[in-house]
Amino acid sequence: VQCTDCGKFIRPVVALDIDGTMGDYHSHFYEFACHWLGKSPPTPFYIDNLGLDLHTYRACKLAYRQGGMKRTMPMYYFADTLTAGLRKLGAEIWVTTTRPYNRLDNIDPDTQEWLRRHDIQYDYVIYDPDKYENLATQVDPGRVVAVLEDLPEQCDVARKLFGDGAVVQRYNGWVLETAPSNLEEHFYDIAARIGEWND
């Protein structure tokens, strides 16, 4: 799509979450918590706060962040190929995260290193608890063709800002057969959206 005023090519935007979407944060953090606590948490990794009291949970999460564990989080299969493919299709890729950039000095270096190690291609990174509100102030919301996110509450925010059609939930939708089940399938879904944008 070209701008009618300046003739400049306007690229479609794809927003990709990191933790739980491109990287296997949940099981990685759970494994860390087992070692940090010296025992398994009271509940599985998919239960809020692992069943721990809030003080203990926050202390554990802070230790995870300060210990550079974000660098060693496993990448989900196909995340690197997904970003390379989206880039080849002309998408502008925004990596979005709620990681607390301003509170911990190592968050940006650890994030950048994780992206580098896994060859994740991107144009911009947003660190913000309100990451999708931030994105909506930086790009025209109409340019956002896809938001790939694992957390339902973040999906709800993105839907309000970018419309129902733009949001793709990384988990749970596939159980109801309403969304792809893995990143490779997500790639083809998002590629089709980019194709529609370009038409």
Explain the meaning of each model-derived region.
Residues P100-V145, P152-V157:
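Substrate-recognition "cap/lid" segment bordering the active-site pocket of phosphatases
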Residues A146-Y188:
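Acidic, Mg2+-coordinating phosphoryl-transfer loop and its flanking beta/alpha structural elements
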Residues L62-V95, R103-Q112:
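Short, acidic loop-to-helix structural element flanking the phosphoryl-transfer center
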Residues C3:
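Short cysteine-rich clusters marking metal-coordination/redox-active sites
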Residues C6-L62:
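Active-site neighborhood of HAD-like aspartate-dependent phosphohydrolases
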Residues T111-I126, T178-D199:
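Structural recognition of alpha->loop->beta junctions
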